[in-house]
């Protein structure tokens, strides 16, 4: 039951404390490892389509496996010193694998700037949590970007890490974070990463396939509990859940669009280039700053449901098996 207790404690530590700036975070070191491995692998493999695919596949194998093995070894060694030390370490990494408070804090900063009618400040705030160009977004565009980020990252930053933490503790949770970090750094379809980043992007799609779909239904239930349009959320999810280049990203975005009766996604600028993207949802009313609070209520409610559901399933399986 150590894993269940560590996940429970880690979740509420994240919910209350978020990620303090002074605390070293595993994702930072994963990012440094990705950069170093990319340089090394690009030197070792030929600069051809096949060579770049092989180099990217090597990265996609080394980083997640290495993250898992290092975490498992450190927890094991800590347990040899004292079981409490192993539990504290596992709790710490469970805490750091989750992003409930971070999502809430960053997105609500955007809401605050919009309510103050500080559009430049709102653009700067949303630029911290999205990959698109934000300098020309209007107020509705800024709010929409924040809503999309909270919806998508509920799966990537909360439900999926919880899913893997409950299955395999901190080692598997950090393995997932390594996959997710790789995708965010090299999983682009541009000249530099089209081939090198393909394995990382595909691995991220596989790792998120089940959690993303669970997340969609958790968000629907949360929409019902928070007074949003749960029926419309299901209808839009059923229609628009694949309106994205990723098979997973629109799963929760479509639920958010339906629950809030708004239109999300569509064309956006990335690195100075317009990227054509399908829309998600229906334009039943304008997007507003208050929708950021609404999606956060849904996200936090869905996070709590996920915690209870996943831990309950683990406990039942432990008893039966």
Task: Give the location of each predicted region.
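Hydrophobic alpha-helical transmembrane segments
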Residues: 1-175, 179, 187-321
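Glycine-rich phosphate/dinucleotide-binding loop and adjoining beta-alpha-beta core of small-molecule
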Residues: 184
């Amino acid at each position: 039951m150590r894993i269940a207790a560590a996940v429970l404690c880690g979740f509420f530590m994240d919910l209350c404390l978020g990620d303090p700036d002074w605390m070293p975070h595993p994702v930072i070191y994963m990012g440094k490892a990705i950069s170093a491995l990319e340089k090394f692998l690009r030197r070792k493999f030929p600069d051809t389509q096949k060579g770049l695919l092989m180099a990217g596949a090597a990265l996609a194998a080394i980083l997640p496996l290495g993250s898992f093995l290092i975490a498992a070894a450190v927890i094991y060694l800590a347990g040899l010193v004292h079981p409490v030390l192993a539990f504290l370490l596992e709790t710490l990494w469970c805490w750091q694998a989750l992003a409930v408070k971070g999502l809430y804090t960053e997105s609500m900063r955007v809401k605050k700037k919009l309510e103050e009618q500080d559009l430049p400040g709102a653009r700067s705030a949303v630029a911290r949590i999205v990959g698109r160009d934000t300098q020309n977004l209007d107020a509705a565009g800024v709010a929409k970007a924040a809503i999309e980020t909270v919806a998508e990252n509920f799966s990537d930053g909360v439900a999926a890490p919880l899913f893997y933490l409950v299955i395999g503790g901190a080692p598997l949770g950090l393995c997932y974070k390594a996959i997710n970090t790789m995708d965010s750094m090299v999983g682009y379809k541009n000249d530099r990463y089209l081939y090198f980043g393909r394995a990382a992007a595909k691995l991220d799609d596989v790792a998120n396939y089940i959690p993303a779909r669970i997340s969609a239904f958790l968000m629907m239930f949360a929409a019902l509990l928070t007074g949003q349009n749960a029926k419309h959320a299901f209808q839009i999810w059923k229609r628009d859940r694949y309106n994205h280049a990723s098979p997973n990203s629109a799963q929760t975005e479509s639920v958010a669009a339906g629950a809030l009766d708004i239109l999300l996604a569509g064309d956006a600028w990335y690195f100075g280039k317009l990227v054509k993207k399908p829309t998600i949802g229906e334009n039943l009313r304008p997007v507003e700053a208050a929708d950021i609070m609404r999606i956060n209520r849904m996200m936090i409610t869905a996070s709590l449901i996920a915690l209870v559901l996943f831990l309950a399933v683990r406990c039942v399986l432990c008893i039966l098996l």
